[in-house]
Amino acid sequence: MTQLAIGKPAPLGAHYDGQGVNFTLFSVHAERVELCVFDANGQEHRYDLPGHSGDIWHGYLPDARPGLRYGYRVHGPWQPAEGHRFNPAKLLIDPCARQIDGEFKDNPLLHAGHNEPDYRDNAAIAPKCVVVVDHYDWEDDAPPRTPWGSTIIYEAHVKGLTYLHPEIPVEIRGTYKALGHPVMINYLKQLGITALELLPVAQFASEPRLQRMGLSNYWGYNPVAMFALHPAYACSPETALDEFRDAIKALHKAGIEVILDIVLNHSAELDLDGPLFSLRGIDNRSYYWIREDGDYHNWTGCGNTLNLSHPAVVDYASACLRYWVETCHVDGFRFDLAAVMGRTPEFRQDAPLFTAIQNCPVLSQVKLIAEPWDIAPGGYQVGNFPPLFAEWNDHFRDAARRFWLHYDLPLGAFAGRFAASSDVFKRNGRLPSAAINLVTAHDGFTLRDCVCFNHKHNEANGEENRDGTNNNYSNNHGKEGLGGTLDLVERRRDSIHALLTTLLLSQGTPMLLAGDEHGHSQHGNNNAYCQDNQLTWLDWSQASSGLTAFTAALIHLRKRIPALVENRWWEEGDGNVRWLNRYAQPLSTDEWQNGPKQLQILLSDRFLIAINATLEVTEIVLPAGEWHAIPPFAGEDNPVITAVWQGPAHGLCVFQR
């Protein structure tokens, strides 16, 4: 190969122009950067990057082609106390690599050293980057742009969703291709889903600790290459990008948006004892929040924290997000531990990354969802994100469970959460859709486990059941575990119905965990991040068709209720909502705080949710008018009820007049 030309300092990463490849890498503190390319025989060829524009190192390799494997060796000081951990003996991944060849195994050679550098060369076993071409024929693809008020989110894992689906071809189960298969798309459409939210698809690594136990990181919240698709979800790693885009194109044709769960808060390099893959060896002090002693601020619980207040790291994160939108046509993002995005180090609404997103004509137009906390002091920021963001509403989750499973929540608190938690989100011009309401998520009990287990059962995770939260607000209804008498099964079913109804008929944006509509159980494991097995894969052969139909009917009912889809805050007297007691009268102040758990919610003056969350059968006097129960609480032809509904214990019903 010829020598490197100077090339251009932008864009970041490796880009093929038809004649060769331009390489760029950011590093403030590097003293020298070597581009290492590998031929078909694995022979390494090294080139110093000749260009150095500001903090960007760059060079152009004529005649280089897509498929070229490469990495970097970065020279600089080894000064751990100052936060510098350069080690040119270690081959490093380009942070903007679009494809990775090789596996991130637990190997001592993939570590830089702790106090002293490990100068053993690792190029023979280190994963390599691959130059790719982004071109793709999108045909007439267009984003669905579903209004927030009409959005129904379905949180799913690429593999877990389809790996056991009997109607999907065996060879594509558990892959990106399966997401775009007609069977899966038809299912999502029939259910009423408008947005498929995928757990992380950017390439991730399994922690060495898990590998030593024979486990793996299943969820994917351990990123190593944020621009590259995780190859294990592809039928062929070389075609992963096209397989993913094929699926998105098919979902878009069906009117379904795709939202990516993205991890912009830490990397798979973990703590100082963790592996060296990329950022730590490129510019540790710039990419991460570093303490005065040279160690990491661990505001994520994962060993390190990305410094998203550094201008270059903001540019990197912004470029990553734009890549997924522009190259893959994704419709939005859910940001894991998103409080990190606003750290300066204190949390600010005008933090640099938030400002960059706000000012970006691409990113400001997609759906943005925050998990609004991290584990550091001041990390709980629910309701405090900039107006462009919606946020996971843990207030809703806890209130719904407490009301239906613990019976210890006043009506006033329940109603506040039902009304999109306006006390939290009605500020800065935000709409009710800013509240992402959920009862369950990937992290925690499944819906079925909420009604079958009082305690977590995480022994399979190898941490002696110490991991996972103990604050589940669950209720096993008298017996720990699945199964039981017919009466027990029916009481659990009623609780599931109540929780689903609360989720899907409340104001705000509902998010349904994949499998909850099946009755999927993880057998009490509320932290199944390392369980890539039948514990987490959805078993479609065991899915409850009745529960699926119930869920679909609720979603389609929601779409008929103007008060829920118009995305306007409810105001007294506007006809959107009336809160009534069991006698169809407005609730008194005392009833709101101390009254029995009986409530009628009249929506759009036509739809009535009658709730009896007590343990006794109770007569509920309906408002004036001719009412009939509607699906999924009754068939299509139902007798008119003009006066009283016999509310079963711990039950609810929806009527229309």
From Swiss-Prot:
InterPro entries: GlgX_C, GlgX_Isoamylase_N_E_set, Glyco_hydro_13_cat_dom, Glyco_hydro_13_N, Glyco_hydro_b, Glycogen_debranch_bac, Glycogen_debranch_GlgX, Glycoside_hydrolase_SF. Pfam families: Alpha-amylase, CBM_48, GlgX_C. Pathway: Glycan degradation; glycogen degradation. Its EC number is 3.2.1.196. CDD domains: AmyAc_Glg_debranch (cd11326), E_set_GDE_Isoamylase_N (cd02856). Signal peptide: none annotated. The active site is at 336 (nucleophile), 371 (proton donor). It catalyses: Hydrolysis of (1->6)-alpha-D-glucosidic linkages to branches with degrees of polymerization of three or four glucose residues in limit dextrin. The record marks 443 as: Transition state stabilizer. It comes from the Bacteria. One of its GO terms (molecular function) is glycogen debranching enzyme activity. One of its GO terms (biological process) is glycogen catabolic process. Disulfide bonds: none annotated. Residues 460-479 are annotated as: Disordered. Keywords: Carbohydrate metabolism, Glycogen metabolism, Glycosidase, Hydrolase. Belongs to the glycosyl hydrolase 13 family. Removes maltotriose and maltotetraose chains that are attached by 1,6-alpha-linkage to the limit dextrin main chain, generating a debranched limit dextrin. This is Glycogen debranching enzyme. It comes from Escherichia coli O9:H4 (strain HS).
